[in-house]
Amino acid sequence: MTELKTLLLFLATAVAEIVGCYLPYRWLREDGSAWLLLPAAASLALFAWLLTLHPAASGRIYAAYGGVYVFVAVLWLWGVDGVRPTVWDITGSLIALCGMAVIMFAPRGA
């Protein structure tokens, strides 16, 4: 799988997970409708399915995915929550992305 396809798949996976967790949050913390749980469940199912599309070992996928999740969560903070990330938020998320790149794209010995 090419690096770009891997990154795009991780981004889609992160959005699916965040939406799947955000909707119950809205229901519980912001008096949202219980109907929010239906798309939340679908989003979390999509998240789990997307994780299976990666060709690498599951442990490596989970470890690398964490870096992308951090980055997308900071974007969510800005775009959905309306909170501008600090320089430390951005720096930390970029470090996490670097960790993902090392885990996923480093040369592997035979």
From Swiss-Prot:
Any Gene Ontology CC annotation: plasma membrane
Main location: membrane
SUPFAM superfamilies: Multidrug resistance efflux transporter EmrE
Family matches, as InterPro entries: UPF0060 (IPR003844)
Locations listed in the record: Cell inner membrane
Keywords from the UniProt entry: Cell inner membrane, Cell membrane, Membrane, Transmembrane, Transmembrane helix
Descriptive protein name: UPF0060 membrane protein azo2656
Family: Belongs to the UPF0060 family.
Membrane topology designation: Multi-pass membrane protein
Organism: Azoarcus sp. (strain BH72)
TM annotation in the entry: 4-24, 33-53, 61-81, 87-107
